[in-house]
Amino acid sequence: MANVVQAKDNSQVFGVARIFASFNDTFVHVTDLSGRETIARVTGGMKVKADRDESSPYAAMLAAQDVAAKCKEVGITAVHIKIRATGGTRSKTPGPGGQAALRALARSGLRIGRIEDVTPVPSDSTRKKGGRRGRRL
């Protein structure tokens, strides 16, 4: 696990919060600045019992609060946020838990550095799932 980080009086100790918000689940994953060491990783599915609630804003909020508590324990006082949707040939908008997770991190007392959208956007995509005539209902 991560060691406790010592900071100077007025300086911030930064981590990177990677929020992956799909329509099925929300991941809140905090690493050090290089991304090599995981400090905390909690998902919406770890916080609620019903499968349908995994991607809900409430589950994302609980996950983010857990992650924030772990960050403070380790000594991280500020985070850069990278928010991501499924992307590629699928949805390029983050799921319902993305905004809630971001707000929960901000309200928990962690300072927010940069907020960046890192959804993978294809320059020229592979063929989309569903076939020539698309998904028929």
From Swiss-Prot:
Pfam families for this protein: Ribosomal_S11 (PF00411)
GO biological process, one term: translation
Matches recorded under InterPro entries: Ribosomal_uS11, Ribosomal_uS11_CS, Ribosomal_uS11_sf
Alphabetical keyword list: Ribonucleoprotein, Ribosomal protein
Signal sequence annotation: none
Gene Ontology CC terms: ribonucleoprotein complex; ribosome
Region spans: Disordered: 116-137
GO molecular function terms listed in the Swiss-Prot or TrEMBL record: structural constituent of ribosome
SUPFAM superfamilies: Translational machinery components
PROSITE patterns found in the cross-reference section: RIBOSOMAL_S11 (PS00054)
Composition bias type Basic residues, residue spans: 128-137
Family assignment from sequence similarity: Belongs to the universal ribosomal protein uS11 family.
Protein name stated in the entry: Small ribosomal subunit protein uS11
Species this protein is from: Kluyveromyces lactis (strain ATCC 8585 / CBS 2359 / DSM 70799 / NBRC 1267 / NRRL Y-1140 / WM37)
Gene expressing this chain: RPS14
